[in-house]
Amino acid sequence: DYEEGTFTASYNTTAGNIGTVTYDARTARYTKIGRLVYITIRLRTDSISDRGTGNVRITGLPFTHVNNANARAVSTNLHTAAWTADDSPTSILIQHNTTYMNLYQKDYNQDTTALPVAALNTGANDNDIRISAVYETSQ
């Protein structure tokens, strides 16, 4: 089974309460080969009316990640620009049985922590992220 397509990726929060987000760059593509889904995402915001609460995530993945707690997916490539100083994402994690990815950062102790919504800038040409990742689906 082979499939190619596009999907709509969006910034959101773990609480699901981000305000209106306007994007000046927003592309997302996938290739599905068997049960593996290869994705590329590019998001850059022009404005965010309200950051909301919780931590930052990207929603709208084209297929649900396999429902297996041992089958988490991480990014194979991640590039970021125009985030709040010292608060840019350094990795992603797609939780099992979901269609979203949570964003993470390295803190001053080099521990990986969830990226707080305070890291989101609300101005133009901000929160630029480019991701390539692979994950498994049961579909």
Q: Model regions: which residues?
A:
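Surface-exposed molecular-recognition determinants
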Residues: 1-139
